[in-house]
């Protein structure tokens, strides 16, 4: 019921795709330990219900079975999800290049997702290498966040030690930051609204 309603609402909102997973709730990052997955029948039902609800939303079926039951079970689940109507497969956290190649060979012609997390479970091949294997979507969910976090830590360390951040350090200029944030457009919109009230 929840899957059907969510997918129907997403379709009405114009969403192009939705990811459905086989992890239990509360879920964990795919590159963390101690994950658990729901039975295959339950996970498959989620996919089937989503597909029966609409054909207008792409269904990305994710399995975390490599971590809990190994690659063979993850492949079995992916086969079942495809048969139930999934459009894209996301087999989370392969632990070697061989596993990535096995997935790509097994699902030739099926759009595949690779999730690359620095210091995570999956090796970090170049995006073009993954593309050649057949991965259509490559996620780098924390790459920028990890780099920014180190920069924040350095700046706050300098401040905590009574100093000031290095003014010559690589950074975005304040006016460029405001431009990136869309401040000019916001100001123009506020001016437009102010003029409408006069």
PLM-predicted stretches and their roles:
Residues 145-198:
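Extended, intrinsically disordered, low-complexity segments
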Residues 1-157, 192-198:
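Alpha/beta enzyme core
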């Amino acid at each position: 019921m929840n899957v059907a309603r969510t997918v129907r609402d997403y379709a009405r909102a114009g969403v192009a795709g939705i990811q459905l997973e086989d992890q239990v709730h509360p879920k964990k990052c795919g590159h963390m330990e101690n994950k658990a997955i729901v039975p295959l029948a339950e996970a498959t039902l989620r996919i089937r219900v989503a597909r029966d609800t609409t054909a207008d939303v792409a269904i990305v079926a994710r399995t975390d079975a490599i971590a809990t039951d190994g690659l063979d079970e993850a492949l079995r689940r992916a086969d079942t999800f495809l048969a139930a109507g999934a459009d894209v497969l996301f087999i989370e956290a392969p632990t070697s290049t061989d596993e990535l190649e096995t997935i790509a060979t097994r699902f030739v012609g099926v759009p595949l997702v690779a999730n690359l997390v620095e210091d995570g479970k999956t090796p970090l091949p170049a995006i073009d290498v993954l593309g050649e294997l057949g991965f259509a979507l490559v996620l780098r969910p924390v790459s920028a966040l990890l780099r920014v976090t180190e920069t924040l830590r350095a700046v706050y360390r300098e401040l905590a030690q009574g100093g000031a951040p290095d003014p010559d350090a690589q950074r975005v200029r304040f006016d460029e930051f405001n431009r990136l944030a869309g401040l000019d457009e916001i100001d123009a919109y506020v001016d437009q609204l102010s003029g409408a009230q006069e």
